[in-house]
């Protein structure tokens, strides 16, 4: 964990692996296709219960930088708003995290839902070899969606570290926004540093995205929280990585914000996929 902040830091499959995901979940209220593509096939779930589900509607690598760097994106289903899922750090393999889940299949049966692999994860190209900040990551996602011809409005849903990305995207692109969901996202720390947790240094081998996590994410958002006009749902898991009180800090990001508590662990979308999907669809209709 990161200095007591509750974020697991490790690789998929390790004891402290961080399989972070983005979802919206049902609970008890407790507070306030396109261009530049190199398409690649993939094995995807084809059923939701006994109902057939169509193959991906977007599936490929899309150019996000002038030097030719590409990120991998997959979308399923049709409809609007589009739900964009963002996983945590350092496990930025959103497609692997979300693709083979009942939660994702339920969403795709009702609207378009997209997941992507951030830089140096899955089938995406390596990140530039320099410190990267929140603007860099949001620019990657914005360019990726544009290159793939995936239009808004969007519901940005991010778990743990991915929630910071979702909230900052919302701050930067309010006109493309239908809502934001934060799943078990601890409040940012104003003091977290690489001296305390060496693995979050931008050039540490455990940080292949080269994200400058201390000053450019944790400290930045603790001192200047993202702000946006769209509805915000803060999900706190009863067995998750941070308390209800801690995560209430995110509520100031939107005037239309509330917090819910869901029984489950950090990956609560796996514990209650039907409830998670139902709550997302409720937000889409607002």
Please name every model-derived segment.
Residues 270-282:
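Post-His helix in hydrolase/transferase enzymes
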């Amino acid at each position: 964990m990161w200095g007591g902040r509750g974020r697991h830091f490790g690789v998929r499959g390790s004891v402290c692996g961080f399989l972070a995901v983005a979802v919206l979940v049902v609970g008890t209220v407790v507070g306030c296709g396109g261009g530049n593509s190199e398409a690649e096939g993939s094995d995807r779930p084809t059923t939701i219960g006994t109902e057939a589900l169509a193959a991906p509607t977007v599936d490929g690598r899309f150019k996000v930088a002038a030097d030719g760097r590409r990120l991998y994106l997959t979308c399923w289903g049709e409809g609007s708003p589009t739900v964009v899922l963002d996983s945590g750090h350092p496990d930025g393999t959103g497609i692997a995290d979300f693709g083979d889940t009942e939660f994702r299949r339920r969403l795709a049966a009702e609207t378009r839902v997209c997941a992507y692999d951030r830089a140096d994860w899955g089938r995406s190209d390596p990140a530039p070899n320099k410190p990267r900040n929140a603007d860099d990551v949001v620019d990657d996602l914005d360019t990726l969606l544009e290159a793939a011809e995936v239009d808004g409005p969007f519901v940005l849903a991010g778990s743990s570290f991915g929630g910071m990305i979702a909230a900052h995207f919302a701050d930067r692109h309010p006109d493309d926004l239908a809502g934001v969901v934060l799943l078990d996202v601890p409040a940012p720390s104003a003091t977290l540093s690489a001296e305390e947790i060496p693995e979050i240094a931008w050039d540490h081998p455990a940080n292949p995205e080269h994200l400058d996590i201390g000053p450019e994410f944790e400290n930045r958002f603790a001192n200047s929280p993202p702000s946006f006009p769209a509805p915000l749902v803060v999900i706190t898991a009863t067995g998750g990585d941070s308390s209800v009180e801690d995560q209430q800090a995110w509520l100031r990001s939107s005037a239309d914000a509330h917090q819910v508590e869901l029984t489950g662990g950090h990956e609560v979308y796996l514990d209650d996929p039907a409830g998670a999907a139902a709550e997302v669809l409720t937000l889409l209709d607002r």
